[in-house]
């Protein structure tokens, strides 16, 4: 393997839109373990550039799409334990609802998921409609926001002021509405958009651009 990362828990369409099979690995690019020697020897950068040209630069999730579209297709990517890239969505949903929400073709191990949330090695503060803002933004409710601020206070950036919440009105409305919806209704509604509507829209856009 030339690249390892944590499974991003995405539906089949996110893979097939990249030319992958539904069961192929699809990893998140937040934390990566790279075999640099193999990377250079096999000219992976050139492969990436060729893939970008072939798709006119229009690739879902940009660099994440490129790395999966190239290396997963070659069978050169592997999966790490989720504790090494414990994403915000892991904290926002329990395992059962995360699988219902994302509908991955090959669900990750539930015990590993629970272990990651309980004892993460690396916390990835990513965007998530349920916890939309990061800990350097005023009002963050992430369970590790306090820990982040404790380490920030010990860093050279301790005097850097907190950023304001600059989400758009629709983004804030989505966060509020989904927080008051019944859990099952919210999960099924967002799942339909996430696994069907968004990938379909991206696929149509890419076809038009080609």
Give the predicted meaning of each segment:
Residues 17-19, 109:
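Eukaryotic intrinsically disordered and solvent-exposed regulatory patches
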Residues 1-17:
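Conserved donor-nucleotide/metal-binding helix-loop-beta segment in metal-dependent transferases, i.e.
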Residues 20-31:
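A recurrent flexible, glycine/aromatic-enriched loop bordering the glycosyltransferase active site
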Residues 29, 34-210:
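A glycosyltransferase accessory/donor-loop signature
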């Amino acid at each position: 393997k030339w690249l390892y990362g944590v499974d991003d828990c995405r539906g089949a369409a996110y893979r097939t839109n990249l030319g992958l099979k539904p069961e192929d690995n699809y990893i998140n690019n937040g934390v990566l373990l790279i075999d640099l020697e193999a990377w250079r020897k096999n000219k992976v950068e050139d492969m990436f550039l060729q893939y970008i040209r072939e798709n006119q630069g229009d690739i879902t999730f940009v660099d994440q799409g490129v790395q999966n579209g190239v290396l997963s297709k070659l069978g050169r990517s592997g999966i790490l334990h989720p504790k090494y890239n414990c994403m915000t969505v892991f904290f926002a949903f329990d395992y059962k609802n995360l699988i219902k929400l994302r509908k991955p073709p090959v669900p990750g191990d539930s015990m590993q998921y629970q272990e990651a949330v309980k004892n993460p090695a690396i916390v990835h503060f990513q965007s998530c409609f349920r916890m939309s803002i990061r800990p350097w933004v005023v009002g963050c409710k992430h369970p590790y926001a306090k820990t982040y601020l404790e380490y920030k206070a010990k860093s050279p950036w301790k005097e850097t002021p907190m950023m304001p919440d600059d989400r758009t009105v629709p983004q804030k409305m989505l966060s509020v509405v989904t927080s008051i919806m019944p859990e099952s209704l919210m999960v099924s509604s967002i799942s339909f958009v996430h696994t069907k509507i968004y990938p379909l829209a991206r696929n149509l856009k890419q076809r038009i651009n080609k």
